């Protein structure tokens, strides 16, 4: 393998990664396709209207559950990221010009799909003077304006912890402000060279101080130890993280970081217990859990824990329900 799919020459790291064959998944890495009525209706609507979601385009295994709950995820900022993380499927390169109409189109897609809760994520845009802060903030504003009954979770890059850029984003008041740390300090620089562990924690702390519900994610299987996961959870909680999701790393291609270990459901259950003991109001852990999985319900848990009443238009999120990809659910089958 000498070139990436987008035609650029492979980085030395990618050449080294590609020398390790793609790993065979263990038996517990699987999902069941349960196509309920809400999913079927949404699937047909998305096809008819030509809408685009991360759920479909990334082949997310949880699409059946999330769409049944009328939840979906959108990617903004284009398909080229200015940073490269060794686990991420998104290409690294020179992004296209900023599309100022994108926030409106995303809001219209949310409306057309009748979503109850939407997650918006995007690429890092270090090529822009504001790092893309306006784009992220405006997308939240447009969704809220056109869909006052829909919750918005905003998953952001770190914006280099720039106070002005963070203020722009925080001022859009998403229901949840997410910034994913993804891995533990010892291997952080190797996995996420353009980010800094302490800077990511700082972003979360600032969001919490601004009164936002905060969220982060850890990906296991990239070389960390269970003990290091516990320490990272402690760091995240002390930084002010309300919601934590924990998942198994699945290698997107040979040029990405090899899978170092397959984490059994039993270990995910242990990490859930640890996170709950540390005081996280919302916890979801399992091999196929993703950061936007059951996002609305986790938001409802966090607001209840903080004594914040759920807005009437989002009261449905407090309803109890199962989560098929949660580790405890896998073990009970």
From Swiss-Prot:
Its EC number is 2.8.1.8. Residues 67-281 form the Radical SAM core domain. One of its GO terms (molecular function) is 4 iron, 4 sulfur cluster binding. Its main location: cytoplasm. InterPro entries: Aldolase_TIM, Elp3/MiaA/NifB-like_rSAM, LIAS_N, Lipoyl_synth, rSAM. The keyword Cell inner membrane does not apply. SUPFAM superfamilies: Radical SAM enzymes. The keyword Cytoplasm applies. Its cofactor is [4Fe-4S] cluster. [4Fe-4S] cluster 1 binds at residues 55, 60, 66, 292. It catalyses: [[Fe-S] cluster scaffold protein carrying a second [4Fe-4S](2+) cluster] + N(6)-octanoyl-L-lysyl-[protein] + 2 oxidized [2Fe-2S]-[ferredoxin] + 2 S-adenosyl-L-methionine + 4 H(+) = [[Fe-S] cluster scaffold protein] + N(6)-[(R)-dihydrolipoyl]-L-lysyl-[protein] + 4 Fe(3+) + 2 hydrogen sulfide + 2 5'-deoxyadenosine + 2 L-methionine + 2 reduced [2Fe-2S]-[ferredoxin]. It is found in: Cytoplasm. Disulfide bonds: none annotated. Pathway: Protein modification; protein lipoylation via endogenous pathway; protein N(6)-(lipoyl)lysine from octanoyl-[acyl-carrier-protein]: step 2/2. It holds the Pfam family Radical_SAM. [4Fe-4S] cluster 2 binds at residues 81, 85, 88. Keywords: 4Fe-4S, Cytoplasm, Iron, Iron-sulfur, Metal-binding, S-adenosyl-L-methionine, Transferase. Binds 2 [4Fe-4S] clusters per subunit. One cluster is coordinated with 3 cysteines and an exchangeable S-adenosyl-L-methionine. GO terms for cellular component: cytoplasm. It comes from the Bacteria. PANTHER family: LIPOYL SYNTHASE, LIPOYL SYNTHASE, MITOCHONDRIAL. Belongs to the radical SAM superfamily. Lipoyl synthase family. This is Lipoyl synthase.
């Amino acid at each position: 393998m000498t070139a990436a799919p987008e035609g650029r020459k492979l980085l030395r790291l990618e050449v080294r990664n590609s020398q390790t064959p793609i790993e065979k998944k263990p038996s517990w890495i699987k999902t069941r396709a349960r196509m309920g009525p809400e999913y079927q209706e949404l699937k047909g609507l998305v096809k008819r209207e030509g809408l685009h979601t991360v759920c479909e385009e990334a082949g997310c295994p949880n699409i059946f559950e999330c769409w049944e709950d009328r939840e979906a995820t959108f990617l903004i900022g284009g398909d080229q990221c200015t940073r490269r993380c060794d686990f991420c499927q998104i290409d690294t390169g020179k992004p296209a010009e900023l599309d100022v109409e994108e926030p409106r189109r995303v809001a219209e897609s949310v409306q057309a799909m009748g979503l109850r809760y939407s997650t918006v994520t995007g690429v890092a845009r270090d090529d822009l003077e504001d790092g893309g802060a306006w784009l992220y903030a405006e997308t939240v504003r447009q969704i809220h304006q056109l869909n006052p009954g829909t919750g918005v979770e905003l998953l952001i890059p770190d914006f280099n912890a720039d106070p002005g850029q963070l203020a722009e984003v925080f001022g859009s008041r998403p229901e949840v402000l997410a910034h994913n740390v993804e891995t533990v300090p010892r291997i952080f620089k190797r996995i996420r060279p353009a980010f800094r562990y302490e800077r990511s924690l700082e972003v979360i702390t600032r969001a919490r101080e601004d009164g936002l519900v905060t969220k982060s994610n850890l990906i296991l299987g990239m070389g960390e130890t269970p003990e290091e996961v516990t320490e990272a959870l402690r760091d995240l909680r002390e930084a002010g993280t309300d919601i934590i999701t924990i998942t198994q790393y699945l290698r997107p291609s040979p040029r990405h970081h090899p899978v170092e270990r397959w984490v059994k459901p039993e270990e995910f259950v242990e990490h859930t217990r640890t996170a709950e003991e540390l005081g996280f109001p919302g916890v979801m852990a399992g091999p196929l859990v993703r950061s936007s999985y059951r996002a609305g319900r986790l938001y409802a848990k966090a607001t209840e824990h903080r004594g914040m009443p759920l807005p009437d238009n989002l009261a449905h999120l407090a309803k109890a329900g199962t989560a098929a990809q949660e580790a405890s659910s896998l073990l009970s089958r």
